[in-house]
Structure formats: structure tokens, C-alpha cells
């Protein structure tokens, strides 16, 4: 947990540095704004790295807690699963948050750019669908490899099926269907489900 706290604290510092050019501009500090703007790319790279390490660190915590976790959810590949799931969860969150922001601030966007938001959402949906299918295939291979067939017909097994089918496979198909048929509403519902 100490490592995860460090990742989180450093990520918050990186996020503050990413946002600081706006504060410097608001305070009319032009030299500071230019300096902070030059730090942005390095800070974004640091932030992405820290968030990836944060997700793998959470997954590594599960490796140490094997006796306390049901065998359907425990795997030696849990850090990889955490990493892959964080990708599609992040894409889904961007779709959800972007939709809300677009509705609230659409009056501030020039009309010629309204359609570009839809294209961005379709691209994010395609990425989320691919990532969710990769995650599902990985989960299925681990399930088959670990020979956990006897655990499926239990109460915890039913919850596992709800998670894997209801919150991974169905949203993945919804993202793919929404991308293929250019349906923003289906993509938004899938983003909420994921």
C-alpha cells in the first residue's frame, strides 16, 4: 500500500503540474506559463507511467492475498489483468465524462467542430471494444488453464459469470456494435456498464 500511496501522491503532483499553465495564465504570469507549458509533455509521460505502475501495484497486492481471494478471481497474472482492465475502464470513463462535458459545454464549441467529438467517441469505443475482448479472452484462457469448471456452479461462480459476461463481454459487443453502426447511444450505455 505504501507503493500505491507514493504512486498516487506523485500522480497528483504530475496532474497539478499539467494544470499549472492555466493557473499561471489566469495570474498573468507569462514567463511562468511558458516554462510550465514546456514541462507538460514530460509531466504527461510521468503521469501515464505512474498510473500504469499504480494499477500493476494494485494487482500485485492481490498476488499476496491468495488465501483471502476466491480462486475464480485469483491468478498469477492478476497484475496484467489489472493493467488491461484499467485501459478499457479509462476509455469508458473518458466516453462517459466526455459526453457529459460535451452536453454542458457544447455552446462553447464552434458548430464546425461538433461532429469531431462523435469521431473521437467512435475511436475510443473501438479501442475499448478491442481491449475488452483481449481481457475476456485472457480471462477465459486463465479459467480453462486453471481447470476451474467445478467452481462455476456455486454462488460465487454465478457472480463471476455476471461480472465476466455482464460487465465485460456484453459491453464489448455493445462497443463493437455501436462503432460499426455509428450509434452513440449504444456506446454511451456500454461505457456506463463497463
Please report, for each region that a protein language model flagged, where it lies by residue.
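Long, contiguous internal "core" modules enriched in hydrophobic/ aromatic residues
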Residues: 2-180
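Substrate-binding/catalytic groove segments of enzymes
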Residues: 181-185
